[in-house]
């Protein structure tokens, strides 16, 4: 089964053994970060460093002309993508460019009007608002530029839609604020100026909606169905505008380049895998495939099956398996997880993450990639 692994460019750049180590696992594809959120990561095998800390940014040299007049522009973290790509391709490994789109602390902090503002008025600087025209333009320019990166064979878009409340950083102390069930979704609903305009256009009073959302989040009263319908409709429309603009920009910049979107069939999903109807997302002019977060073996098969049922025939459905024990994965069961995902309708696999994996995790990835029989 077609299997690729995630990597960061700093896992490869400066480590002459990295590409051979990845190829030695039996992997022939790597999804390599070209635009990523702020991160602190281990680099267990690198000869220069063990812990890498990076702010949100891009890992290639942008074209200044491409960004002329843009309200939002990415910062360059380090231009290591090109060298990492060349090293991997030299070892016979194809490279997919991996972009994180609406999860960006730097831009959300600098341009708070483009970040999510919850029903209480709190701004989430890590979460760019999918309903913002400036964010749509930023996302489209980013994806179009990345589509032209030399040496890549495909593009993967993470967080290409609604981000939200959940965000593991900043010494997080929010574990008790979001009740189970709809709590995280309620805290993810945006009431920035753009979203308020969208609710108003749908015939609702934004202030009234915000009061209802606050009451529901505080456990005072359930959110009325009519209010939920307005919110769901406006948010779905905004997400589709963003994804549609991004995909159109990629098609114009690099016709024929395969594009996969990290998504979830639950329309209220937010975060790295935001909610989209697979039938729409991969319909005419849409993405070539969906990447699913199958990190929980208990729910993974159902997630894949629901997506496969809703997606158009021929859609690529990639199941991402968590291969790192230190991140909560179960590497010993990777082969069984892969079999279950395939039986449910997955057409290919991703393993997260070959750069973060310890030697035991890498051994499990190697076993997974062994030819059957």
Region locations from a protein language model:
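Hydrophobic faces of well-ordered beta-strands that scaffold small-molecule active sites
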Residues: 3-7, 28-33, 95-99, 153-157, ...
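The substrate-binding groove and active-site-proximal loops of carbohydrate-active enzymes
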Residues: 4-12, 61-79, 122-137, 228-238, ...
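Active-site-adjacent "subsite" loops/lids of carbohydrate-active enzymes
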Residues: 6, 96-147
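Short, acidic/polar
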Residues: 11-24, 133-146, 269-285, 302-304, ...
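Catalytic domains of carbohydrate-active enzymes, especially glycoside hydrolases
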Residues: 16-47, 145-154, 279-291, 343-348
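Polysaccharide-binding and catalytic clefts of secreted carbohydrate-active enzymes
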Residues: 122-253, 258-283
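Substrate-binding cleft of secreted/luminal carbohydrate-active enzymes
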Residues: 286-301, 320-373
């Amino acid at each position: 089964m077609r299997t690729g692994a995630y990597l960061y460019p700093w896992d490869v750049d400066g480590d002459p053994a990295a590409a051979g180590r990845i190829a030695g696992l039996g992997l022939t594809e790597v999804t390599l970060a070209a635009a990523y959120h702020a991160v602190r990561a281990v680099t267990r095998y690198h000869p220069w460093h063990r812990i890498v800390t990076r702010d949100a940014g891009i890992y290639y040299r942008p074209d200044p002309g491409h960004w002329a007049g843009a309200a939002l522009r990415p910062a360059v973290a380090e231009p290591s993508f090109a060298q990492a790509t060349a090293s991997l391709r030299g070892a016979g490994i194809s490279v997919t460019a991996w972009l994180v789109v609406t999860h960006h602390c730097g831009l959300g902090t600098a341009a708070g009007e483009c970040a999510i503002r919850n029903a209480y008025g709190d701004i989430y600087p890590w979460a760019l608002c999918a309903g913002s025209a400036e964010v749509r333009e930023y996302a489209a320019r980013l994806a179009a530029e990345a589509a032209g990166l030399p040496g890549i064979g495909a593009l993967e878009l993470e967080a290409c839609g609604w981000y939200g409340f959940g965000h593991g950083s900043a010494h997080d102390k929010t574990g008790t604020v979001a009740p189970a069930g709809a709590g995280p979704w309620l805290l993810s609903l945006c009431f920035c100026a753009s979203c308020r305009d969208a609710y108003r256009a749908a015939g609702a009073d934004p202030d009234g909606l915000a009061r209802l959302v606050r009451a529901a989040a505080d456990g005072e009263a359930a959110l009325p169905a009519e209010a939920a319908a307005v919110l769901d409709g406006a948010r779905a429309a905004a997400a589709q505008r963003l994804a549609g603009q991004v995909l159109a920009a990629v098609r114009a910049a690099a016709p024929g380049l395969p594009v996969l979107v990290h998504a979830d069939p639950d329309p209220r999903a937010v975060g790295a895998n935001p909610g989209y109807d697979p039938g729409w997302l991969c319909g005419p002019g849409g993405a070539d495939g969906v990447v699913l977060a199958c990190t929980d073996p208990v729910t993974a098969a159902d997630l894949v099956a629901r997506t496969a049922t809703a997606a158009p025939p021929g859609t690529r459905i990639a199941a991402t398996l968590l291969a790192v024990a230190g991140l909560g994965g179960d590497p010993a069961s990777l082969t069984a997880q892969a079999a279950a995902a395939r039986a449910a309708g997955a057409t290919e696999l991703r393993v997260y993450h070959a750069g973060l994996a310890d030697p035991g995790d890498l051994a499990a990835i190697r076993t997974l990639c062994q030819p059957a029989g």
